[in-house]
Amino acid sequence: MGACAMNPQALKGSAMLAAAMLLASGAAMADVAPQAKAPTIAKELQQAKTYTISSPPTAPLEMAKPALPALSGYTDAAMEKKIVRAKPGKISIRRMMQEDALKDFIGGDNKMAEWVVRQHGIPQAIFIDDGYMNLKDLLGKVPKQYLSETSPGVFLAKLPIVVGRKGILEIDKKTQELRLSQEAGSFLINDGQLFVRDTKVTGWSEKANGPALYKSPKEFRPFLLAWGGTETYISNTKMASFGYANSKSYGVSISQYTPNMAKVLKRPEPTGWIIDSEFSDMWYGFYCYETTGFVIKGNTYKDNIVYGIDPHDRSHGLIIADNTVYGTKKKHGIIISREVNDSFIFNNRSYDNKLSGLVLDRNSVNNFVADNEFYRNHTDGITLYESGDNLLWGNKVIANRRHGIRVRNSVNIKLYENTSMANGLTGLYGHIKDLTDTDRDIALDPFDAKVSLIVVGGELAGNGSGPLSIDSPLSVELYRVSMLAPTKSSGISFNGVLGDRQEEILDLLVRQQKAVLIDPVERQTELQD
């Protein structure tokens, strides 16, 4: 689709750009003129004098690229094998009160009023329990005022549909489209096993006789939520017009139960796969909370409202691969935030998003970000906030409006063989920031105002204000980094603490082809292993 058409162009453009800059920069790499220092950076110069420049051995920097997880097992055929159809399920219509899976939507703050108004009475839901049910089988078993076939294969649901703890619901190609009524307050809850394959599920406005298109954050729109202990599998499906600004109602959400309920229910973390599907006009394209091993592969997330893909709190072991994310209207294409650890983000394309292409945020550590393309995002290509011990390898970060790669308050960030080119500001920008006077909850999201980087290989070329700027680093190690001139200058210039020692650094890095270690004199702190 859009991505396929645009991707080769972006890469072709970057190759042409590189060739043009090689010609334009001429001997920029061999003959770098030190720039006159403006008086305004006196403080930086004073800091710079407290750093030593040395050439460490290169052997410890030579690292083989870690293996990425195989994706061949995550297929529709493998999904099909997981469906147990042996035991027919039971269907009932029950009141929404007293149901664990619905407590979050019924409890305090007069939450029940929403459903009373939409259903014109005591709120009810359709429940599938104790076995397998195909959505088409619900017809005839559920009164027509709650679920009807409006044209062949097109179903309109006017109540929430809940897959019970031992329930299995399959929505497949027998369903051309499932429409969840916005006016009647329909949504989909998985508390068991849910399979959505070869179909279409849409938040539907009966009034407009069309999708429940986004109008405002607080306006109810149908959504899908899977709770703790569940498995959710979606393949070759189009989902659109889900979600709004209300807890767990964001679009497609996979979430452990809330802490108080989780203590009582003791259900394991939820999991599942979403493959080869398309999500558009969602408040969040994907959200998860305390989720394990979830796979998001080969999907398109386009024109969603706040985020495309948003794994959150303490989710881990995720695979986010081969996705195309573009046109996110309010924030980032992909963001992992608050202790989302030990995950793989690779072979994705994220472009034309309102803020960054990818963000690693709030102490998300030990993640491997490889072989992605982040381009034409309206702020940074890749942003790391307060998230140390991450490895970025072989990413192409091109023509983003601000920095290519920005690293804030994050230590032991390893950047291998990345290309950061033609970005509006800096190719690679490392800095510290004191967040104590912000609205941040420091107990929930602690931070250290420290930054340290290892940069090996790759290319920093043609960025608007220079290849590299690092402010107050704990340490920086550079080796085999190719740098070409920024667009606004005849030669390379470093900003931040590197500026004062630029000639020394470039002599080692470019002319002598050695590694460079920039280390504060006062601490000489080693990078944490």
Curated annotation (Swiss-Prot):
In which pathway does this enzyme or protein participate? Glycan biosynthesis; alginate biosynthesis
Q: Which InterPro entries match?
A: Beta_helix, Carb-bd_sugar_hydrolysis-dom, Mannuronan_C5-epimerase, Para_beta_helix_rpt-2, PbH1, Pectin_lyas_fold, Pectin_lyase_fold/virulence
**Which compartment or compartments is the protein found in?**
Periplasm
Taxonomically, which superkingdom?
Bacteria
Query: Which UniProt keyword terms apply here?
Result: Alginate biosynthesis, Isomerase, Periplasm, Repeat, Signal
Named from the GO MF annotations, one term is: isomerase activity
* Leader peptide range in chain numbering: 1-30
What protein name does the entry list?
Answer: Mannuronan C5-epimerase
Gene name per UniProt: algG
